[in-house]
């Protein structure tokens, strides 16, 4: 066999192997030690979560994190070439270049930020916005150079203010960023509003109450997301303490939002609604509740009024959720801030093609004394680099 033909055959075999490897469902899970462990540890695990894989539930590799970072959430930029990791314990934002292997954490100093929570990136991939719940501000950053460029703050008694910001959503088509007012980190005070910013400038425009109860309602709006493909734009909001789901509709003429309640989790004996997730089409909405641990499925055909369809059991602390690429499986990370009673530590696996049947749970981290804080699917260009890497635990 000629060297050229041998090289061609080798390439074909390599591509075939890579293709098979890329069929895996790989996920990023940042985790920390459960309370009471003799040695505290934090890391990002890359795990195979495909129920049909021989490596189901196995950790394939890890990226160590500082043990005192208290890494919280993982977010991607628009083309998923970067991952950002927020931190509750230090005024740092970490970024990982997903196009380079091995993966390297780079710390971005954000000295004005205490208790970094959520991050969004502008549609042109040039600016990120980071909510800082402890310092009651939003940091705008250059998403190319990854440096902070502006600190946005506005204190009460101003009519428009930023207080304990947690959730954040962006819509560059209307030049707006919305942030929720959640809770003071020590839980001594609770917010009840959403604040609207001008995305291009960071100007604080307006603040809106998210509760039908008299103030102080202490509703704690926590997460906010724009419903995909909605025209005019619609946001959905979860209130952690009040246990409700809200919507906000953009009025193009008035250039403002109006907000109203669309669901109450109380009658279903659920509390602490947290994260939201949409399918690609945008006609399905998933909302997790930490107590006692459920995923609520809605028909989101009309995002102005999502219709509740079913509640699927997860585990205490049901928090972040991801869909498999074909949207057959739903994976729910069950842990909230290492809090007692709502930090199960597992990942619930749900088969949506079978009416929301719970197939079981991934207890890999839980069994080792860890709690996952977030789950995100690994971008495809990442997966190809793991075809020969197996450091299973």
Where are these regions (language model features)?
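Bacterial N-terminal signal peptides
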Residues: 8-18
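Bacterial N-terminal signal peptides that target proteins for export
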Residues: 1-8
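Predominantly soluble domains enriched in secretory-pathway, periplasmic, or organellar proteins
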Residues: 22-393
